[in-house]
Amino acid sequence: SPDPASTGQILQELAEGMRDSFNITVICVVPSYNGTVAPEYQTQRFFCENLDAIKVIRLRVPGFNKKNKVSRVKNILAYFVGAMKATTIVGKQDYVFSISQPPILGGLLGVYGKWKKHAKFIYNIQDFNPEQIMAVKYEESRFINGLMMWFDKLSCRKSNLVITVGRDLADTLESRFKNVNVPKCMVINNWINEKQIYPL
C-alpha cells in the first residue's frame, strides 16, 4: 500500500475499487511513515511498481524526525518537487485526484497535474488546513495565513469537483467563498473495510 496511515489505506481501497473501470496510476512517497526510509528505497529517484494492476510511482524522499520541523519541511518539499516531476512522466491522464495532504501543497499538485495533463481535477479535502492553523494560532503571521488561504482557495477554484469528507467541511468551503461562486462540491464520508478493521 502507499502508506499505512488511514488516509493511505482509504486511497488504496479507492484505487482498487476503480481499477476494473480505469487505468490507475498512483504517485506517492516510498514507505517512510515513521520517518525512516529503507536502504532499498534510497538508490534512485523513482521506483515504479505494479500492485494488483495499479501502477505505482514511489518518490524517494529524505528521512525525517517528526519532532524536527526543518527535517519535516525538507521531506514535504522533496515530495512536492518529486511529484511534479513524476507528473510529467506518467503519460496521458483523464483525471487527476489529489488530497489536501501535504497541507496546501496537495491541492497545488492537483492544479499542476490538471494543467500539465489537460485533465479534470478532483480535489479531496480531508482537512481545511489554513482554518485549522488559524484556530489553534499555530502560525501567528497574518501574511503567511493569508498566503496559505489564497493558494488553497486557488486549488478549490481550479478543481472540477471538490470532495469533502463531511458536511462541516462543505460548510467551511461555502464560508471560505462567502457563498459566492463556490466551487462544485460533493460530500463523501470516509469509510472502513469491515472485513479488515474490527474491534480488539
Annotate each predicted stretch with a short phrase.
Residues E174, P183, W191-L200:
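Acidic anion/phosphate-binding donor-loop and adjacent secondary structure
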Residues I54-V81, K137-E140:
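A short, charged, and often flexible helix/loop element on the N-terminal side
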Residues S100, G166-R167:
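Helix N-cap/beta->alpha junction signal
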Residues Y95, N160-L161, K184:
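Well-ordered beta-strand positions
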Residues R72-T88, Y95-K117, Y123-Q126, P130-E131:
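An aromatic- and histidine-rich active-site surface loop
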Residues S1-D52:
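N-terminal subdomain of nucleotide-sugar transferases
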Residues M84, L105, Y112-K116, R142-T164:
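Membrane-proximal helix-turn-helix segments that form the acceptor-binding/catalytic region
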Residues V30, D168, I188-W191:
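Carbohydrate-associated surface elements
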